[in-house]
Amino acid sequence: MIDRASITYEHFSELGFMKMPFMVENAWFSGSCEIKTYALEELLGTKLRALYQRKKGRDLFDMDYAMKRVEVDIDAVLRCWRRYMAHGGKTAPTAKEFLSNMEEKLALPEYCDDVKLMLRPGTDFSVDTAYSFVKGSFIDRLATAVVTKKV
């Protein structure tokens, strides 16, 4: 049974909602629409929160995968992360606390192996390489990141 107290629901957007086109064409149906969604930086901000709060290696994979494929505004991601941490009633951890949290998780085989069965064969993924990249991109910047307000 799902513990509903542990599920988070956000009904706001730090960066504003956006619309993305969506289209389906096949023998059964053809159509298009626009889907209301979040900016990538906002999604990565919530993923960074998940990386800190959950013991799921897939969060590390998701951060690494997105960052290596699309240019991302790191400061916007960190701004969103802080907002979502505060929304959940939590104080954003310091860089030292985040590093300690990650070191504990990286010592757990179940954390490191979490994503393996979800990846298609041939997908190249190294937990150590991904952590080094995400750490350098985000965690190391927590101590120096400037918090800017939404305009």
PLM region spans:
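Structured mid-to-C-terminal alpha-helical surface segments
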Residues: M1-V151
